[in-house]
A protein has these predicted regions:
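Extracellular/periplasmic carbohydrate-active domains that bind, remodel
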Residues: 1-150
């Protein structure tokens, strides 16, 4: 799947949400969601869920929730399918406002593995990188690498 050089404004919910995909590239994408009120609920930017071999590069994301969220299923369903989100590269991105720049979870019952975040700028987010889960959710996070972030 290739999503490249598009601008998305005011998506009503999670903006780009590939699920159970292999070989996903999101490049040169601009997301303003919402464009005027940076506090809109559930206005995530890019949310790969149970995907493998994902590259997110050279994106500009300004949202009211999380800019990029890595997911892999929720509770019993996530454990039942057991498909991790893995081999994720996030590089050369600018993330503004929102709760988190890059967030792992909270829907991560299938696990998250081999994530690299590099050369990214977080400006005005509540947190740059955030790991979150809920009681009883389960799932592992393995091999998280972070390099040259501001």
């Amino acid at each position: 799947m290739l999503i490249e050089n598009v601008k998305i404004v005011n998506s009503p919910f999670w903006t780009i949400n590939p699920a159970f995909c292999d070989n996903v590239t999101v490049h040169g994408v601009t997301i303003y969601n919402p464009s005027k009120d940076p506090k809109g609920p559930n206005t995530d930017g890019i949310n790969p869920s149970s995907c493998r071999n994902v590259r997110i590069s050279d994106c500009f994301i300004s949202v009211g929730d999380d800019c990029i969220t890595i997911k892999s299923g929720r509770d019993a369903d996530g454990r039942k399918y057991g498909k991790a989100c893995e081999n994720i590269t996030i590089t050369n991105c600018v993330m503004l406002s929102g709760h988190g720049g890059v967030v792992i979870g909270s829907e991560m019952s299938g696990g998250v593995r081999r994530v690299t975040i590099s050369n990214c700028v977080f400006d005005g987010t509540d947190s740059g990188i955030r790991l979150k889960s809920s009681r009883g959710r389960g799932g592992v996070v393995e091999e998280l690498r972070v390099d040259n972030i501001v």
